[in-house]
């Protein structure tokens, strides 16, 4: 149905709330609020013009709806700086007056749908076809006018283009004046919305109809779903029967009576996950009987509502950008978000994958990003939807300063990678020190007990018990874990220190033998090429690694 009707390092922003959905407001000055509200209002205006006038869809419909709801929230938060909410259909009206206004639909969530259905009878549901709305006016059995939805009252003249569509009967048996409202959609045989999403089908139709000419191939790709007959029979069954006789059969095929909420939910789920010949973005619930067309207005009515499918993309506000640095020096930017719900999951953070990706997107606190769930329900950033009016400078780590042989000590700028080394060392693929995690290492580091990767070897129960946050029992358990680490076998220690992968190479139980190997000797081992051979030699030759070896040798650890 119609698109634009909606009710709906660490650097932190000064936001007090986890989400606007909780009715909290940004902690902005009046000047900042005015700038942010004006910027969003202008962005919405640009999107409206692109869609309704130019036939382009620069942003997904569900993101548009969320952006409009965000502006409404901000206007409520800052009434003194509120920007007049842009009329979605401003600039889209054409010269032709609709014989019956297009109403649009209120979009309800599950709880609101339950309440709406509870007070009504004779209810029906249809797929909410994802296309562009149109009025068709027939007289003497022939199409007299086709009018774009426009602002609901006036629209553009699409008659010449719509007459070329094979989806419309060329001649009707009915001679009297007929007024039909429906959706022009792009044909997608076997389309499963839950798997394929909208596939920009709506934008494709809008773009084609914005052209001056329409070729035969494109015309054949456009279908028609008539969803109402304003001057037709008062009864829904009679309207569906009449439309089928006139040659508009899809309405009957995809209209179902619903006696209760469970049935409505069942059809919504079915149409979301089963093949349909078109894209759809939810279902429409409507009363079988509604007021006659002459009483309709260009605003959401009380007799029909939309219940959208689960969001494929969520609009999320970036609260912070954190740069995670792994033990090998890989830098992974991570966005901290105001929590958003997507497919029944609450998303609080999302990784960007690489420093290059972050630089390409140039994401900063305050920006609004589109989030979707990728394979295995992993959240990912699709795009920056719009940028904050005020964008603070955001320093980032230097990639040249972080690599496989950097940050063996907690020097300035090395804290993150050093902690990652400790985390690996004590983890399951390292020394497997059960109960010793990142929090333990952070506590020891904050108390000045870790000058290098093996500083913990010197900590006994008495020294640990002196530290804030360590009781007698926890100190005893941790000291036992540290003592047990000394007894771990040589290969386990090599992995824990960060030995580059050695494939199927035979590793003698002696540090001296391994450290004495050159690249040529390493390449004689199965699975080791020139690059890996150089990495292995560099590891054993690095001064910090050699210093760790001396610590372990002095501690009596096997193999060193």
Swiss-Prot record:
GO terms for biological process: DNA repair; DNA replication. The active site is at 128 (n6-amp-lysine intermediate). Coiled coil: none annotated. It is an enzyme of class 6 (ligase). Keywords: DNA damage, DNA repair, DNA replication, Ligase, NAD. One of its GO terms (molecular function) is DNA ligase (NAD+) activity. It catalyses: NAD(+) + (deoxyribonucleotide)n-3'-hydroxyl + 5'-phospho-(deoxyribonucleotide)m = (deoxyribonucleotide)n+m + AMP + beta-nicotinamide D-nucleotide. Pfam families: DNA_ligase_aden, DNA_ligase_OB, HHH_5. Its EC number is 6.5.1.2. NCBIfam families: PRK08097.1. Belongs to the NAD-dependent DNA ligase family. LigB subfamily. Catalyzes the formation of phosphodiester linkages between 5'-phosphoryl and 3'-hydroxyl groups in double-stranded DNA using NAD as a coenzyme and as the energy source for the reaction. This is DNA ligase B. It comes from Azotobacter vinelandii (strain DJ / ATCC BAA-1303). The gene is ligB.
């Amino acid at each position: 149905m119609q698109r634009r009707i909606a009710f709906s390092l660490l650097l932190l922003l000064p936001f007090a709330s986890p989400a606007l959905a909780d009715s909290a407001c940004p902690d902005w000055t009046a000047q900042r609020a005015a700038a942010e509200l004006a910027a969003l209002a202008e962005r919405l205006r640009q999107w409206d013009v692109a869609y309704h006038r130019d036939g382009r869809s620069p942003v997904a419909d569900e993101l548009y709806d969320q952006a409009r709801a965000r502006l409404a929230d901000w206007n409520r938060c800052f009434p003194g700086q509120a920007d007049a909410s842009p009329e979605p259909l401003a600039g889209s009206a054409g010269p032709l007056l609709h014989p019956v206004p297009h109403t649009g639909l209120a979009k309800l969530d599950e709880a609101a749908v339950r309440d709406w259905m509870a007070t009504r009878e004779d209810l029906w549901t249809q797929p909410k076809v994802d296309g562009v709305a149109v009025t068709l006016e027939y007289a003497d059995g022939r199409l007299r006018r086709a009018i774009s939805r426009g602002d609901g009252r006036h629209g553009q003249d699409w008659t010449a283009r719509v007459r070329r569509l094979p989806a419309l009967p060329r001649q009707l048996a009915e001679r009297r004046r007929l007024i039909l409202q429906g959706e022009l959609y792009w044909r997608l045989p076997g389309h499963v919305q839950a798997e394929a999403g909208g596939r920009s089908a709506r934008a494709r139709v809008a773009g084609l109809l914005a052209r001056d000419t329409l070729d035969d191939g494109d015309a054949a790709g456009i279908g028609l779903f008539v969803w109402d007959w304003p001057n037709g029979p008062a009864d829904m069954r009679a309207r569906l029967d009449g439309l089928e006789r006139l040659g508009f059969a899809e309405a009957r095929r995809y209209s179902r009576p619903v006696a209760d909420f469970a049935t409505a939910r069942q059809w919504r789920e079915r149409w979301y996950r089963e093949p349909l010949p078109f894209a759809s973005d939810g279902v429409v619930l409507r009363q079988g009987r509604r007021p006659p067309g002459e009483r309709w207005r260009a605003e959401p009515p009380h007799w029909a509502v939309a219940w959208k499918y689960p969001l494929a993309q969520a609009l999320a506000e970036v609260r912070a950008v954190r740069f995670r640095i792994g033990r090998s020096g890989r830098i992974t930017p991570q966005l901290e978000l105001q929590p958003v719900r997507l497919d029944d999951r609450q998303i609080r953070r999302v990784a960007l994958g690489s420093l290059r990706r972050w630089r390409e997107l140039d994401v900063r606190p305050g920006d609004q990003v589109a989030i979707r769930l990728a394979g295995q329900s992993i959240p990912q950033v699709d795009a920056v939807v719009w940028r904050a009016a005020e964008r603070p400078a955001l320093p980032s780590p230097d990639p040249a300063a972080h690599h496989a042989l950097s940050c063996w000590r907690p020097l300035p700028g090395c804290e993150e990678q050093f902690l990652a080394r400790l985390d690996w060392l004590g983890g399951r693929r390292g020394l497997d020190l059960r109960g010793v995690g990142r929090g333990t290492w952070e506590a020891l580091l904050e108390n000045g007990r870790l000058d290098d990767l093996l500083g913990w070897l010197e900590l006994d129960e008495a020294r640990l018990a002196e530290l804030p946050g360590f009781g007698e029992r926890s100190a005893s358990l941790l000291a036992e874990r540290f003592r047990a680490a000394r007894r771990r076998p040589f290969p386990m220690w090599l992995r824990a220190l960060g030995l580059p992968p050695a494939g199927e190479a035979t590793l003698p139980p002696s540090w001296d033998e391994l450290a004495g190997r050159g690249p040529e000797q390493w390449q004689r081992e199965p699975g080791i090429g020139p690059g890996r051979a150089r990495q292995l030699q560099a590891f054993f030759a690095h001064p910090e690694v050699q210093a760790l070896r001396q610590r372990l040798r002095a501690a009596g650890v096997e193999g060193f």
